[in-house]
Amino acid sequence: MFKRKKYVDNPYPKFVQPKNHKKRPAFIRYAMRCAAQTDVARNELYYTNPLKNPITGCVLHRKRRLNEHRARALRAVVQAMLYYFNIASMLVMASVEKLSDVCGLSTYSSAGNKSITRASRLITQFMEPMGLISCEKIWDKILGMYIPKIIYLKPLFFMLFDISKIRLKRVRIKQLEWINSQLKKKGEYPITLLEIEKQAKEKHIHSALLFRKSKYIIKKQKNKAKKFLELDEKYAKSYILNNLVKKYSTKELCKLGLTKLKRKVNCEYFRLKKLAQLPVV
């Protein structure tokens, strides 16, 4: 008898606040409560508002309602988007990968390769065509690839849990007034909502580039560790020992002693072993 393949890896995704959790503004906390108390996956707006291609604007034919797995993913992603939402700029200050991770939607293959398909398809095939969000892709000429897409929340997103366009506008103006009052205290000039949006966009791009750079460094170190561990253990430890000896003076080596030096060699060997086993993100 054949065992049925799992439809999804995590059938009950849930948004989990990061460990370095900071208290979010009152409006965001209120919006998260409203979204949690409303079934955002089963809303009449989905039946009155047709799916549209975000590039061409053509109406897309919808065959069926959201299946339960995608509905659960949507409920989790809505919470995550609100948590990372910047009120004044309307930007979600997190990448699709970050949203996927905090909602438990990311999966890993047997080879350790990371997949965020479940979250990215929800965003590109449903949330964006429905008009809940809009996404912007920016091409990095230096790296020759796209920077993780910038996500903007649209008024329709908030209408899912009964926050009107007028109320959202009022909250944004209030936030702008607070930002300008802080700038005034510093002796700086006031700014507009458009300038805030531009600054938030630049911050998102900068963070994305830093994250990509750190991923590249880790990958490079991992590949180096893998190649190193292909060597015989005795030879590998001998190589580590020679490198450690170069770091210390004769006086420092005498003070360190043979036992402590051996312990340092073992620690470095097992650190490289652990690094080589890290999943590819």
From Swiss-Prot:
An example GO biological process term is:
DNA replication
Keywords, in A-Z order: DNA replication, Plasmid, Plasmid copy control
- Lineage: superkingdom: Bacteria
A Pfam family that the UniProt record links to this protein: IncFII_repA
By its UniProt entry, which InterPro entries does this protein fall under? Plasmid_replication_init_RepA (IPR003446)
Query: Which NCBIfam families does this one have?
Result: RepA_IncFII_LM
This molecule's function is given as: This protein is essential for plasmid replication; it is involved in copy control functions.
Q: Which family does it belong to?
A: Belongs to the IncFII RepA family.
Q: What is this protein called?
A: Probable replication-associated protein repA1
The scientific name of the source species is Buchnera aphidicola subsp. Cinara cedri (strain Cc)
Tell me the classification of the organism that encodes this protein. Answer: Bacteria, Pseudomonadati, Pseudomonadota, Gammaproteobacteria, Enterobacterales
